[in-house]
């Protein structure tokens, strides 16, 4: 009985192969079975503990016979189960290794797909971040541009107000017809005042004349104010610099508006840049893979294409820089054209102002001549009054009785005033260029006019001498005349001549005065 229990139990190789082929090895169940082996019944455990299991050779398998008996068969089946499981696990592992060795390309494809997914996710995140940064920069730039625009608009409004003020001053400087009439009225009143001062008969002026004097003083103040404004008519250098600065700021505003209208980059170029960034990322990824694995020839060709495409973004950046430079040059050209136009306008204004200043100077000269003529007219009126006084002395009467000559002098003076006083239309309007050309074509007429003016200057000097003589005569006439008592003889004292003149008869003096006046010009 003891020998029966010690006999080894073996299986034929055909049965073991059939079991391996028919039963597939489950992966999960193998691990569980390895962790938790199936327990054996107690009689089998004792037999296994006492006797080792021996694997017989092929020759012994032929001579061995199966022992019939229920307990032995159960023990054999229970012993075969862990062995079969170990064999199945080994076979499965070998099968997996064989599949891995046969399919390296599938593994590369799977790894490549995983890496592509990771790259796409990373690129999408970077794209979102770049979009956010671009939006923030655009918002900041728009805010800065708005602030600059507001500042420039405020400066332009202030300087426009200054320009309007200057234009108002220029309008005030152009004397209207009413102010010219006031000037003439003032000159007449000044002549009356001088005439009253010369007479000196009225020690106290009436209330009307006092009011007239105050009114004259006010008008003189207005004249001084107008002259002061005329001096300010020429625009100072500071205002000219402000005007140039204004023009530059307006050009900058237009340039900023143009920049706002033009997008930074068109959509096509933005898409190209993004595509190039993706290709660069792919290049880096391919280089990393190239270091890890030996790449086939197709991937090497792709690498070369990608390297060629790397040079394209540099070319695009150069084109973008050239476009920006061209846009800046166009803005500068427009700004220069605007500056030239504004300078031409300012030159025209300056020429117009210079013409006005020359006209004002000419008017002032004519006003001075008018004042001088009015003074002479007042002196002649005084002489007429003196002619109407009683003649106490015969010699004084002969010298003072020249009404006809004085009337001729008055008429001649009136003609001179009419010639000197330019009409208002000629003062307000410049001469027509055709008239100026005609005047230039006849230099003889201009020489005649110059000679005539020199004669008038000589006449004015003679009138001043006559004025001195008349003042002396007036002083002699104002001396009290004593009537002679009856029986007395009055000594008639002749009037002594002035220094430098000999005593001439009345007829010679009349001839001398007639010679001094030139013949009338047609």
Curated annotation (Swiss-Prot):
Per the record, the domain of life is: Eukaryota
Keywords from the named record = Cytoplasm, Keratinization, Repeat
Spans of biased composition, class Polar residues?
Answer: 1-15
| Tissue specificity remark | Keratinocytes of epidermis and other stratified squamous epithelia.
State the compartments where it is located: Cytoplasm
Where is the segment annotated Disordered? 1-126, 159-329, 366-496
Pfam families (UniProt xref): Involucrin, Involucrin_N
Q: Which PROSITE patterns match?
A: INVOLUCRIN (PS00795)
Please describe the quaternary structure of this protein: Directly or indirectly cross-linked to cornifelin (CNFN).
Role, per record:
Part of the insoluble cornified cell envelope (CE) of stratified squamous epithelia.
Protein name per its UniProtKB record: Involucrin
Q: Which organism is it from?
A: Hylobates lar (Lar gibbon)
Provide the taxonomic classification: Eukaryota, Metazoa, Chordata, Craniata, Vertebrata
